[in-house]
């Protein structure tokens, strides 16, 4: 009984056939993969993020399915953080006032912009209306006018502008009306509302005014609260390893700052959720910001996170919160990295739009666009 064995040419022929099959299978998979990515790219609503900071607003819009075209931020450390977390985004480290119309359009390849988002710093609240000039005329509010300029240039379907809640009532509501009028002159229907981030899952009582403009004149709707029971400080940061003042950890940005012996002694008297009144009168600070020398309450949302939380202590550990913990109170994910010196990192966190709030706003914009 004989055995038939294949010669080399037959083996080579089989190998070539199999290789060809695998080649076409891989090629078809790659075509399908990149085609799906391209379709998502083409169908996604696009946005520009002005005064983007560390990227809280961008993160929320990305999660809702938007496609970023450009972000503009002047501060170097903010840009470093943004680039580290959004490697596929285009971010310009530049003063928006020096970015010409032509260069802005060139950076986005003259693509259609669907949404312009941002929170322009407005410093002229205290004086506008009191010395005979309007909010828009106050030179300290020139960045607001830059936001208006970009909206006028790109003519997006929508714009979303976020700012501090006191703008709603400033100058008996005249400032709010003036801002609205600036955009109405460009043909936008505009509404504004004060939103509390805690209503959307952020473990923090943080109220912000949000202006939404719509180019087609359709109905403007704001996101409906998703949380009647608020997430708490304990919910947000209870899983992080305990640290003493000055200690570090292997977790990203989870490094405790040093405190003076006097500060640690004073704060040792303050109970969970307590304030300076818990400190013995002989040690108690006589004056100063009432928002300092307090402890977070483990079973309540956080007080509003700012760029300096060094005298607001952990509910059970005798130290201020780490950047990682503060970021969690702003609803940033645990893998979101913050770069720069610690105080710069804290400022990045405190000045950010909470991603969960941003996502809720983005989803409201998507819904309006779908129902146009």
Swiss-Prot record:
Residues 45-372 form the SAM-dependent MTase C5-type domain. It is an enzyme of class 2 (transferase). CDD domains: Cyt_C5_DNA_methylase. GO terms for biological process: DNA restriction-modification system; methylation; negative regulation of gene expression via chromosomal CpG island methylation. The keyword Methyltransferase applies. Its EC number is 2.1.1.37. Keywords: DNA-binding, Methyltransferase, Restriction system, S-adenosyl-L-methionine, Transferase. It catalyses: a 2'-deoxycytidine in DNA + S-adenosyl-L-methionine = a 5-methyl-2'-deoxycytidine in DNA + S-adenosyl-L-homocysteine + H(+). PANTHER family: CYTOSINE-SPECIFIC METHYLTRANSFERASE, DNA (CYTOSINE-5)-METHYLTRANSFERASE 1. A methylase that recognizes the double-stranded sequence 5'-GGTGA-3' and protects the DNA from cleavage by the HphI endonuclease. Both this methylase and M2.HphI protect DNA from cleavage by HphI. Belongs to the class I-like SAM-binding methyltransferase superfamily. C5-methyltransferase family. This is Type II methyltransferase M1.HphI.
